[in-house]
């Protein structure tokens, strides 16, 4: 990750170590901040503090010198090896197919404690979203994680006599619209804010996330774009508390229209707004695999249409969406898109990938010096309180810029056959991490 030829997304995982610059930019032959005093110890020396250093460095995998055998400036061989997984963990990969899934067998060389890793085989199966519940009922699938589709949850809730059940917990996931700040109408901050005020997110949630159990809550409108399971800022992100000075986009059609009026976007004879000869046209790009689009797209069509927006939606395969929004040569092909992100940890640093100017997932192409300064202050410190305060400022600043609009946070449901037990999952501890205690009760 410190090599100058590294093309991956995780260079920030090591760029704060002593010797990084000398290795990455100079002629140093090794990173001086990494020491191995014996066969079982790795010592890291940091050039500057980083709030997530312990978790970031602590999850790096240990592998053989054979796998990492390469010359500086030539990491291509290491990258090729990424498609040939190795390891000394409790399971080993038996087969893998991009179209069908994967299978893993228990590693006979792994010394597990008594009672751990009782499941001998794991099969990860690619299924159609429209038939996965039927497969769960038929027994061809035993476990479906991270379900937020109300219809599927309702089906399992009714089918408990068929041997099905579910677990639930607050999700680390936040779904969001992101707006293209580099091309098209959404370059104008006023347009972004108007679109935010003009989308009734509460109505969307009530329509899409509707459980039969009236006391159960599946989703909520987040307050800010950020990590919903943040150790310090989760209440602000989830909207349970208000942050001082933050912009909150409660549905307000008249306010949205006024913002556009004030910004010079006037309604033309055809009902579509325009400014300086440019029509207020929004090209919406979304993944067709997402069931939510059947609800969201008609709502955006109607509600943004009321603002004088020429709305055009296009759905395509998820991977095509990602490649399109990430391609600078295609920056004029879309204006707004929809994605979700699972933050996986209680640290705020995961948001850097999206809203930092050089963030690898900054699909909105947001660039703001003030925002970057808050993110840097939050990341490069060892003071937990100072980090939380800086990230909250970043969340508030991003809300004002409105490149990312959080649409829904959810309660995650994991649907399973009752015979699968011992999966002690949570928002930051997924099923694969829980295999030590999982077992099949036949």
Each predicted region: which residue ranges?
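Detector for C-terminal structural segments
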Residues: 199-238, 292, 297-301, 326-442
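Ligand-site clamp/hinge motif
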Residues: 76-82, 109-155, 310
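Ligand/substrate-recognition segments at binding pockets and active sites
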Residues: 98, 248, 265-340, 412
């Amino acid at each position: 990750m410190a090599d100058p030829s590294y093309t991956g997304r995780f260079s920030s995982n090591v760029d704060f170590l002593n010797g990084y610059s000398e290795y990455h930019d100079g002629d140093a032959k090794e990173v001086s901040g990494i020491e191995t005093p014996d066969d079982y110890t790795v010592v890291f020396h940091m050039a500057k503090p980083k709030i997530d250093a312990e978790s970031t460095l602590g999850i790096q995998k240990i592998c053989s010198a054979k796998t990492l055998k390469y010359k500086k400036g030539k990491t291509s061989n290491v990258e090729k090896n990424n498609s040939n997984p190795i390891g000394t963990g409790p399971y080993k990969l038996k087969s893998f197919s991009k179209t069908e899934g994967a299978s893993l067998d228990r590693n006979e060389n792994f010394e597990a404690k008594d009672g751990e890793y009782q499941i001998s085989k794991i099969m990860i199966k690619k299924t159609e979203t429209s038939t996965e519940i039927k497969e769960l009922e038929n027994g061809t699938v035993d476990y479906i994680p991270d379900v937020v589709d109300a219809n599927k949850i309702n089906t399992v809730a009714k089918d408990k006599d068929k041997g099905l059940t579910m677990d639930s917990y607050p999700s680390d996931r936040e779904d969001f619209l992101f707006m293209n700040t580099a091309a098209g109408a959404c370059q104008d901050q006023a347009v972004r804010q108007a679109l935010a005020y003009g989308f009734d997110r509460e109505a969307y949630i009530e329509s899409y996330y509707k459980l039969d159990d009236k006391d159960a809550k599946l989703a909520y409108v987040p307050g800010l774009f950020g990590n919903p399971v943040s150790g310090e800022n989760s209440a602000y992100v989830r909207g349970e508390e208000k942050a001082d000075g933050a912009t909150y986009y409660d549905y307000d059609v008249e306010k949205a229209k006024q913002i556009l009026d004030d910004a010079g976007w006037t309604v033309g004879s055809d009902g579509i707004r325009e400014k300086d000869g440019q029509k207020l046209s929004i090209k919406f790009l979304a993944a067709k695999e997402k069931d939510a689009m059947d609800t969201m797209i008609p709502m955006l069509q109607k509600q943004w249409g009321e603002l004088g927006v020429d709305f055009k939606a296009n759905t395509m395969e998820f991977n095509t969406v990602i490649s399109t929004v990430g391609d600078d040569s295609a920056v004029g092909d879309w204006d707004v898109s929809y994605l979700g992100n699972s933050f996986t940890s209680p640290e705020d640093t995961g948001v850097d990938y999206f809203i930092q100017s050089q963030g690898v997932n900054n699909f909105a192409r947001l660039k703001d010096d003030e925002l970057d300064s808050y993110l840097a202050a939050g990341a490069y410190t060892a003071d937990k309180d100072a980090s939380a305060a800086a990230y909250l400022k970043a969340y508030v600043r991003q809300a004002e810029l409105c490149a990312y609009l959080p649409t829904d946070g959810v309660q995650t449901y994991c649907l399973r056959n009752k015979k699968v037990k011992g999966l002690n999952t949570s928002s930051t501890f997924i099923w694969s991490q829980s295999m030590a205690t999982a077992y099949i009760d036949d």
